[in-house]
């Protein structure tokens, strides 16, 4: 039987609060400065320093601005680190707007195909409701970027620079999602009336293409790659296609890279491959697929790749115990237990099961600090510009990584034969709303 809060209980709560006058100091500070500023731990700031025993040289950070393209920025940053080192470039970037254009067009097609497939289900079914909740968005995962690269290649940022709507995507997303939901109404009716949907869908995609061209620009079919390297030598490669550019200058075989996740919930055994139903961007593209491993395995592969001079794409819950001004991510960064007198004690698995944590953001791991063969902190390249953190770079304690990192992408050479074989097996399909299907923004 449900019970309401009584006035006797309220009096008891108030009395208990008044019995601890030491809390008044914290109360005054919190009410004036906010929870994070009032409880920031100076010991954490002093120990989580931006100094690392192993570090990959990288240039200034990029800036996704007011968009949710972190997963895209992070992946393209791993590519540009390799490219900049090979060609001797400084602060060169690949076009995030180019991949963004194709991602949105392909997500529109992916959504419309799913609407056609589910047209005979009720509008309020959980699956249809999930599809309609967000027809498309900025967010994504590693395998979505792989699909884009394999189909469309990449271009330099100068060949397709940022626009107002690529950097501030809210209005574009609102308009595009309104268009797609309208199209969903039409397609569902057409299926029920046994009308042709292929022609309708093509007309709809033509309208989406027009919308994207008007807001993001039209992607180049060929472009001129001209630059000066760090020795001031002029180089040029004229009329190169985006796929030729990727093959010639980046040339990473993305099929050799394996997404590892750490999801310690009862329904996800370790050393098992997983996928997520209805998650993707390109129809018949690279399927979403991960290998669930223990955290020690994930971190060792990550550290080994960094020690060999290659950065690592990773996905985490960036908002948890993170101080963005200083760029510190640490389980002890805030004195919350001391301030409020109670402790939140959920495990990583419980936070996933009870919707308190999931992958929300993708960044790049560029350094690791190892003392007496033990890792104690990691260097993180964010994509929020240079005004936060240490010129845009963050530092994550190893304890924070354990609790709030959910995915990394590493070369298969850093994994055992048994793990590579496990990844090659048929994956278990997770429901679309599983926390491992969340998108990095």
UniProtKB/Swiss-Prot annotation:
Keywords (A to Z) from UniProt: Aminopeptidase, Hydrolase, Protease, Thiol protease
E.C. numbers: 3.4.22.40
InterPro entries: Papain-like_cys_pep_sf, Pept_cys_AS, Pept_his_AS, Peptidase_C1B
One Gene Ontology CC term in the entry: cytoplasm
Domain of life according to the entry: Bacteria
Catalytic reaction(s) noted: Inactivates bleomycin B2 (a cytotoxic glycometallopeptide) by hydrolysis of a carboxyamide bond of beta-aminoalanine, but also shows general aminopeptidase activity. The specificity varies somewhat with source, but amino acid arylamides of Met, Leu and Ala are preferred
PROSITE patterns, per database record: THIOL_PROTEASE_CYS, THIOL_PROTEASE_HIS
GO biological process terms on file: homocysteine catabolic process; proteolysis; response to toxic substance
An annotated Gene Ontology molecular function: cysteine-type endopeptidase activity
Family membership: Belongs to the peptidase C1 family.
PANTHER family the record matches: BLEOMYCIN HYDROLASE
Protein name: Aminopeptidase C
Gene that this polypeptide is encoded by: pepC
């Amino acid at each position: 039987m449900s019970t309401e809060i009584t006035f006797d209980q309220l009096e008891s709560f108030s009395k208990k609060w008044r019995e601890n006058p030491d809390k008044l100091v914290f109360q005054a500070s919190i009410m004036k400065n906010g929870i994070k500023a009032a409880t920031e731990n100076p010991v954490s700031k002093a120990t989580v320093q931006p100094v690392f025993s192993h570090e990959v040289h990288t240039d200034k950070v990029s800036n996704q601005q007011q968009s949710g393209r972190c997963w895209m920025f992070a992946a393209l940053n791993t590519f540009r680190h390799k490219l900049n080192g090979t060609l001797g470039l400084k602060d060169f970037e690949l076009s995030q707007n180019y991949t963004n254009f194709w991602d949105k067009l392909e997500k529109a097609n992916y959504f419309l195909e799913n609407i056609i497939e589910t047209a005979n289900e009720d509008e309020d079914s959980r699956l249809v409701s999930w599809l309609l909740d967000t027809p498309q968005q900025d967010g994504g995962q590693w395998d979505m970027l792989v699909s884009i690269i394999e189909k469309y290649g990449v271009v330099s940022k100068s060949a397709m620079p940022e626009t107002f709507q690529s950097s501030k995507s809210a209005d574009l997303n609102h308009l595009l999602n309104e268009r797609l939901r309208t199209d969903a109404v039409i397609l569902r009716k057409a299926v029920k009336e046994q009308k042709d949907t292929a022609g309708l869908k093509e007309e709809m995609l033509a309208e989406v293409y027009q919308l994207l061209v008007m807001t993001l620009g039209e992607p180049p079919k060929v472009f001129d790659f001209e630059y000066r390297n760090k020795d001031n030598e002029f180089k040029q490669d004229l009329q190169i296609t985006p796929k030729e550019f990727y093959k010639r200058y980046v040339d990473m075989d993305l099929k050799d890279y394996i997404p590892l996740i750490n999801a310690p919930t009862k329904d996800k055994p370790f050393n098992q491959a997983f996928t997520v139903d209805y998650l993707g961007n390109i129809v018949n593209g690279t399927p979403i697929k991960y290998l669930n491993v223990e955290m020690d395995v994930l971190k060792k592969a990550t550290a080994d790749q960094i020690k060999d001079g290659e950065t690592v794409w990773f996905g985490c819950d960036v908002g948890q115990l993170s101080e963005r001004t200083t760029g510190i991510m640490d389980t002890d960064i805030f004195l919350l237990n001391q301030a409020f007198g109670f402790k939140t004690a959920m495990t990583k698995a419980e936070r996933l099961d009870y919707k308190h944590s999931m992958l929300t953001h993708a960044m790049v791991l560029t350094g690791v600090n190892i003392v007496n063969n033990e890792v104690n902190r990691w260097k993180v390249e964010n994509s929020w510009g240079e005004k936060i953190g240490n010129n845009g770079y963050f530092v994550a304690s190893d304890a924070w990584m354990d609790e709030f990192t959910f995915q990394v992408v590493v070369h298969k050479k850093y994994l055992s034969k048994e793990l590579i074989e496990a990844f090659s097996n048929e994956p278990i399909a997770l429901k679309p709303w599983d926390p491992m299907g969340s998108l990095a923004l």
